[in-house]
Curated annotation (Swiss-Prot):
NCBIfam families: mraY (TIGR00445). InterPro entries: Glycosyl_transferase_4, PNAcMuramoyl-5peptid_Trfase, PNAcMuramoyl-5peptid_Trfase_CS. The lineage of its organism: Bacteria, Bacillati, Actinomycetota, Actinomycetes, Mycobacteriales. PROSITE patterns: MRAY_1, MRAY_2. It catalyses: UDP-N-acetyl-alpha-D-muramoyl-L-alanyl-gamma-D-glutamyl-meso-2,6-diaminopimeloyl-D-alanyl-D-alanine + di-trans,octa-cis-undecaprenyl phosphate = di-trans,octa-cis-undecaprenyl diphospho-N-acetyl-alpha-D-muramoyl-L-alanyl-D-glutamyl-meso-2,6-diaminopimeloyl-D-alanyl-D-alanine + UMP. This is Phospho-N-acetylmuramoyl-pentapeptide-transferase.
């Protein structure tokens, strides 16, 4: 628990202090956000707001992770783990793709950055590398960061994927989550606030896995997860970095995270879900992100097949704006729904453990 508290404190401090520095720097450089011409009229006033604030989030996560482990090495000699570095590597690689996308948008002064092919290739490369490496680095207990067995709240022994299929599965998971968070980042503070809640839920889940790990506490209901405490540290660091960033990103936002932040945060969810063996449970925890990306898919399919739109605008947070909800109303209500989803997800996780141990 000490490491988790340290991780949150460092991440909040770095993010909340670095973000205003980036605001001033990006404002001087003219790194302003471009607004969709077909977007809600109320968003046009946001044109020129500094973007790429995700740099502060990623920096906060890295500083927190290594700062926490620096303290850990001094106290108990434990350093970074393969699982932790894989998740951070995935998030950073996706953040780099997002950074290039943001930079091109700014340089060209339009809301279109990397072309679809380049962006897809970047995400694909990061996902494939993650999938391949997730089945390496076997520890003394025979555990790798990822598992070829599909998982809900723990591995489902009856559903085992071949290595190549597992890598393909990782590509789907990474692509889905990175796009889901990216689509959600359309209102001031919405994605950052929701992400903080999802990561807080993951802190509880991974810390419980650590306390009931088969390697240290064998018995009924134990978890075969490699490096669960390190995953809890990453989840705590991400939650802290999002909270620090939210101080400046809350409505009216002084800076946006951009694709730099949204793609990186999507990578965090994808990485945590795979390494903690909770790929299916993550859909419940991140229900808001799932709903947002689903609204886009539904809108596209409906328009291509019928020529009609289901929503006035997708992602569907814009639909609610266009029907008369104030932006802050949409944000707060979506945060409430996220809190409910996270509570439900944690309850499902814990109830499965109670059922397993026969409590």
């Amino acid at each position: 628990m000490r490491q988790i508290l340290i991780a949150v404190a460092i991440a909040v401090a770095v993010s909340i202090l670095l973000t205003p520095v980036l605001i001033r720097l990006f404002t001087r450089q003219g790194f302003g956000h471009e607004i969709r011409e077909d977007g809600p009229p109320s968003h046009h006033k946001k044109r020129g707001t500094p973007s790429m604030g995700g740099v502060a989030i990623v920096a906060g996560i890295w500083a927190s992770y290594f700062g926490t482990h620096l303290v850990g090495v001094v106290i108990d000699g434990k350093g970074p783990s393969a699982s932790g570095l894989l998740v951070l590597g995935l998030a950073t690689a996706l953040g780099a793709v997002g950074f290039l996308d943001d930079l091109i948008k700014i340089r060209r002064a339009r809301n279109l950055g990397l072309n679809k092919t380049a962006k897809t290739v970047g995400i694909l490369v990061a996902a494939v590398l993650f999938g391949v490496l997730a089945l390496q680095f076997r520890n003394v207990d025979g555990l790798t960061p990822g598992s070829a067995e599909l998982s809900y709240v723990r591995e489902i022994a009856t559903v085992t994927l071949a290595p190549a299929v597992f890598v393909l599965f990782c590509v789907v998971v990474v692509s889905a989550w990175s796009n889901a968070v990216n689509f959600t980042d359309g209102l001031d503070g919405l994605a950052a606030g929701a992400m903080a809640m999802v990561c807080a839920a993951y802190v509880l889940i991974t810390f419980w896995q650590f306390r009931n790990a088969c390697a240290t506490s064998p018995g009924v209901g134990c978890y075969n997860v490699r490096d669960p405490l390190d995953l809890a540290i990453i989840a705590a660091a991400t939650a802290g970095a999002c909270i620090g960033f939210l101080w400046w990103n809350a409505a009216p936002a002084k800076i946006f995270m951009g694709d730099t932040g949204s793609l990186a945060l999507g990578g965090i969810i994808a990485g945590l879900s795979v390494t903690s063996r909770t790929e299916m449970l993550a859909v419940v925890l991140g229900a808001l992100f799932v709903a947002e990306v689903t609204s886009v898919v539904v809108q596209i399919l409906a328009f291509r097949t019928t020529g009609r739109r289901v929503f006035r605008m997708a992602p569907f947070h814009h639909h609610f704006e266009l029907v008369g909800w104030a932006e802050t109303t949409v944000i707060i209500r979506f945060w409430l729904l996220t809190a409910i989803a996270c509570g439900l997800g944690v309850a499902l996780f814990y109830s499965e453990w109670l059922t397993t141990v026969g409590a």
